[in-house]
Swiss-Prot record:
It is an enzyme of class 4 (lyase). It comes from Clostridium botulinum (strain Kyoto / Type A2). The active site is at Y23, H100. This is 3-dehydroquinate dehydratase. Keywords: Amino-acid biosynthesis, Aromatic amino acid biosynthesis, Lyase. It holds the Pfam family DHquinase_II. Homododecamer. Catalyzes a trans-dehydration via an enolate intermediate.
């Protein structure tokens, strides 16, 4: 069985209320339910973690190597400046795919750079919650090929 951890960064717990013109009306809980439903027939366990605190996200990334085959991460605002999260991602030996709900390249100038992307297999941006599903599909296909 594959185990995948989905990490969500700061303010994503406010989805559904925060900037619905950018992020829509869907809540983080709804996103998590849609992900689980999409993969219900897979031999797959998906855990979800959200924190507004950089240190807790770093700890979760570092601990993940013991329990998970891969990480899907939406570092949110931390993606633009957190060298600490980048270093944590680089320190583990499991694949990481970065996801952003909105298209960061159509947003403010400071959002167009993701430092954490340097430690990711790839970045999926602008497809809403479906970006998480795309990331997990990629990971599953990648893990199957490696076996």
């Amino acid at each position: 069985m594959n185990n995948i951890l989905v990490i969500n960064g700061p303010n994503l717990n406010l989805l559904g209320k925060r900037e619905p013109d950018i992020y829509g009306n869907i809540t983080l809980e709804n996103i998590n339910q849609k992900i689980k439903l999409h993969f219900k027939n897979e031999d797959l366990k998906i855990d979800f973690f959200q924190s507004n605190e950089e240190g807790k996200i770093i700890d979760k990334i570092i601990e993940s190597e013991k329990k998970y085959n891969a990480i899907v991460i939406n570092p949110a605002a931390y993606s633009h400046y957190s060298i600490a999260i980048l270093d944590a991602m680089r320190s583990i030996n499991i694949p990481v795919v970065e996801v952003h709900l909105s298209n960061i390249y159509k947003r403010e100038e400071y959002r167009k750079k993701s430092v954490t992307a340097e430690a990711s297999l790839g970045v999926i941006s602008g497809f809403g919650y479906y970006g998480y599903i795309m990331a997990i599909e990629f990971i599953l296909n990648n893990l199957v090929r490696e076996k």
